[in-house]
């Protein structure tokens, strides 16, 4: 008996229906641009209609592939050539950011168009940030009016969280800085940003992406000083930015001072040399005694390897503070400095759980060696303590405070009898 091998079925000639979700027209940049430009020309200056058009077009146009083209058109009216000029061989629209009215109200309305688009098509978020970075690099190729509009728009978008402050890195481009384009653009941008949010919010956004210490880079190296920065931004009506830069400069100086102090303490440099060095730095960097006592405390306590056992760490801390108390005494000559020190001790003990029971012993020691006065301790107890662990620390201090009050009363009665 012979068996004929059965043939397997083949797929030749079979046609499969494409799923609806995969039916997306493929465009090259020129076709894509024509579709967007045509839609924008039809919607005109009605930004609500523009937003609806962009929302619906995403279903049939490939926004993911042509994100750069899309954003070029919305901002400049057409595809941009390197340097910022519009490509000559492409269709363009007169309805875009650069041809709109140069005022904050109009730019806020355009910001809403971008917000709606990116909320609807989340994948455009990264491409939009890259677009703004590119546009900032092209600033020299734009007119002053176009720069102003872009600055206002960017400030609003930074304020409402649609952009990260990391885009500001483009403003540190050497050519933009040398031509003075960067600081002029930054003024418009910060005014717009601060009108959306306060300076604290702006500062937080800058810190988040490590831009807080780079603002001086908006100026050429030979003008990169706080004095020049302050004159420029204060003169432009942005004292908040000027003050922020000053605080950052001071913060940087304090960090360097603390680092140097820790090194000097660990090397066993004499107290006199350390105190003299600190006083010079205080003058040079305009650091108050109130700030200095905090820096000294942090430096002293950061220099140690602390025992993990609670019963041993107290003894270790008291010994360490007693030995270095002259360093604290040198910078606690004012009532406010003493209160600042007490608050720093409170924070330290709260943040380091092994020290929770050590607070009272530290304060008592510093009182005995004349770093802290009776008045400062009483004021801290009654009104100047922090919220951190206050119930624990106030309870610890009750007996000592009662003793101080009684001693004060006895002293007063003795004076009266005399």
UniProtKB/Swiss-Prot annotation:
Keyword DNA-binding annotated: no
GO cellular component assignments: cytoplasm
InterPro entries found in the cross-reference section: ARM-type_fold (IPR016024), eIF5-mimic_regulator (IPR051245), W2_BZW1/2 (IPR043510), W2_domain (IPR003307)
Record-linked SUPFAM superfamilies: ARM repeat
Region Disordered, annotated ranges: 1-29
Keyword rRNA-binding on entry: no
Keywords, comma-separated and alphabetical: Activator, Transcription, Transcription regulation, Translation regulation
Domain W2: from-to ranges: 247-414
Pfam name, any one: HEAT_5MP1_2
Biological process (GO), any one: regulation of translational initiation
Compositional bias of kind Polar residues: 1-15
Family note: Belongs to the BZW family.
Function per UniProt: Translation initiation regulator which may repress repeat-associated non-AUG (RAN) initiated translation probably by acting as a competitive inhibitor of eukaryotic translation initiation factor 5 (EIF5) function. Enhances histone H4 gene transcription but does not seem to bind DNA directly.
Name the UniProt record assigns to this protein: eIF5-mimic protein 2-B
């Amino acid at each position: 008996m012979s068996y004929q091998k059965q043939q397997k079925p083949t797929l030749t000639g079979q046609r499969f229906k494409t799923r609806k979700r995969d039916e997306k027209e493929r465009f090259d940049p020129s076709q894509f641009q024509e579709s967007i430009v045509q839609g924008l020309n039809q919607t005109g200056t009605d930004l609500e209609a523009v937003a609806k058009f962009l929302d619906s077009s995403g279903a049939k146009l490939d926004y993911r592939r042509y994100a750069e083209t899309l954003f070029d058109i919305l901002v400049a009216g057409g595809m941009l050539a390197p340097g910022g000029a519009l490509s000559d061989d492409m269709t363009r629209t007169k309805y875009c950011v650069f041809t709109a009215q140069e005022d904050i109200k109009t730019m806020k309305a355009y910001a809403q168009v971008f917000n709606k688009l990116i909320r609807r098509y989340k994948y455009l978020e990264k491409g939009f940030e890259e677009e703004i970075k590119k546009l900032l690099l092209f600033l020299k190729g734009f007119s002053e009016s176009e720069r102003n509009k872009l600055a206002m728009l960017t400030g609003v978008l930074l304020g409402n969280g649609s952009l990260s402050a990391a885009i500001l890195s483009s403003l540190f481009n050497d050519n933009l800085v040398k031509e003075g384009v960067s600081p002029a653009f930054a003024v418009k941008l910060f005014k717009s940003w601060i009108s959306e949010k306060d300076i604290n919010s702006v500062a937080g956004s800058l810190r988040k992406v490590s831009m807080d210490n780079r603002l001086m880079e908006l100026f050429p190296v030979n003008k990169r000083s706080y004095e020049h920065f302050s004159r420029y931004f204060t003169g432009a009506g942005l004292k908040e930015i000027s003050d922020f830069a000053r605080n950052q400069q001071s913060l940087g100086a304090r960090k360097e001072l603390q680092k140097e102090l820790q090194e000097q303490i660990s090397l066993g440099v004499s107290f006199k040399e350390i105190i003299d060095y600190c006083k010079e730095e205080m003058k040079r960097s305009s650091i108050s005694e109130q700030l200095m006592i905090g820096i000294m405390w942090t430096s002293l306590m950061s220099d140690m390897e602390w025992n993990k056992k609670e019963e041993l760490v107290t003894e270790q801390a008291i010994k360490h503070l007693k030995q270095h108390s002259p360093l604290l005494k040198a910078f606690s000559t004012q009532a406010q400095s003493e209160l600042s020190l007490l608050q720093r001790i409170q924070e330290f003990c709260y943040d380091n759980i092994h020290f929770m029971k050590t607070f009272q012993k530290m304060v008592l020691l510093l009182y005995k060696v004349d770093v802290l006065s009776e008045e400062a301790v009483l004021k801290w107890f009654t009104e100047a303590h922090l919220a951190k662990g206050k119930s624990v620390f106030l309870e610890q201090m009750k007996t000592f405070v009662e003793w101080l009050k009684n001693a004060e009363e006895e002293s007063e009665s003795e004076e009266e009898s005399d």
